[in-house]
Design a protein with these regions (language model features):
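Conserved short alpha-helical segments that host acidic/polar catalytic motifs at enzyme active sites
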Residues: 1-355
């Protein structure tokens, strides 16, 4: 699937996110996994930092390079994926309390890495692995042997290009992830500045970074669902609200008026196609009003593929019933729940399930 999309690559990078992980990690669903790239000195600093806080290593995977380093890929010491047992003095914490402790640790490690240029930390969260690298996606995937048998997952999010409006940076590679919420985007976010400034004003430390204008889609998803407590059906009402005339005739007029006004700085102008994943591994796809970026969903026998091109579906599930391929329109949120039975639609014109 990665190679067939190569016409759209520019060598700027590749990112892969794994959720609902199999193999050795399948028995470690509730403990945090740290993913990142480290120099030898950075790895020592990581070990000291984590031991000082009471974390102990449960299991680890390191990526051994396959052959010569591809053109454009910097020399790295260690690509690391490591699962940790929680500190023993946290054993009385609820699951919610445990999860609250993880993001500050990731942010602190990222700060340490930025200061010394010796570590890049992509994620620190249960049942989550993220690896990113600059360079040609197909060459990088072969170099890191991303098809290894001990690294499997039921949800794989992969994008072969980062935002190239700015300097190339590992943190700018899609997909983006925050506390169980993930997105990757095809397109440009022309409303980036107002989106970013609104999110950064919320007083939540995780709304941070923004080396890509597409990272705001992850954070706005987190804001609307986790921070405000709304459902997925409200995501598009937050970023692409109905026009005022349509709101006046909607069954939830008062609520949608208030949401549009309160979250007006989250509104996007496109062109964007966004693919996302929720903490329970529900997958979805949305389009902006202009619908100038392609997006299609197809599936067969419990396997669904979300892609910007039909050739991506053909490469992964060639024998599916193509009559059921679906391309969401601008009012749709196309959803595949964790049971992976069918594509369900949430339409902005319909009554909200919860408000």
């Amino acid at each position: 699937g990665l190679a067939v999309m190569s016409e759209g690559y520019d060598g700027s990078g590749v990112g892969i996110l794994l959720r609902d992980i199999g193999g050795p990690f399948a028995a470690m669903k509730h403990i945090p996994i740290l993913s990142g790239i480290f120099s030898s000195s950075g790895l020592k600093r990581l070990d000291r930092f984590m031991m000082d806080r009471g974390f102990t290593t449960k299991y680890k995977v390191t990526f051994k390079a396959n052959g010569a380093r591809p053109t454009g890929v910097p020399k790295r010491d260690v690509y690391l994926v490591r699962a940790y047992d929680y500190p023993t003095d946290w054993e009385d914490y609820s699951q919610e309390a445990l999860l609250r402790e993880l993001m500050p640790i990731r942010l602190r490690l990222q700060e340490m890495g930025a200061a010394e240029k010796d570590m890049v930390v992509f994620s620190f969260w249960p049942d989550t692995i993220m690896i990113k690298e600059v360079g040609d996606p197909v060459a990088v995937a072969d170099y890191l042997q991303l098809d290894r048998k001990d690294l499997t997952a039921r949800v794989i999010m992969l994008q072969g290009r980062q935002n190239t409006n700015y300097e190339i940076d590992l943190y700018a590679c899609h997909p983006f992830f925050l506390q169980g919420y993930a997105t990757m985007t095809n397109g440009e976010n022309t409303a980036f500045i107002q989106n970013r400034d609104f999110l950064m004003s919320r007083g939540f430390d995780g709304y941070h970074g923004y080396l890509s204008d597409s990272e705001v889609f992850t954070h706005s998803l987190h804001y609307l669902i986790s921070y405000l407590g709304l459902g997925l059906e409200c995501y598009k009402h937050g970023i692409t609200p109905l026009n005022d005339d349509a709101i006046e005739t909607h069954p939830d007029t008062a609520f949608l008026k208030h949401l549009k006004y309160a979250c007006r700085s989250l509104i996007i102008d496109g062109p964007n196609c966004v693919i996302g994943c929720l903490p329970d591994t529900t997958l979805f796809m949305v389009q902006d009003r202009k619908k100038l970026r392609p997006g299609v969903i197809g599936g067969s026998d419990g396997t669904y593929v979300f892609s910007s091109e039909i050739c991506g579906l053909d490469a992964v599930i060639p024998h599916r019933d193509k009559q059921h391929d679906f391309q969401p329109m601008h009012l749709d949120t196309a959803v595949v729940t964790p049971r992976r039975l069918k594509v369900e639609l949430l339409c902005q014109a319909d009554p909200l399930m919860v408000n």
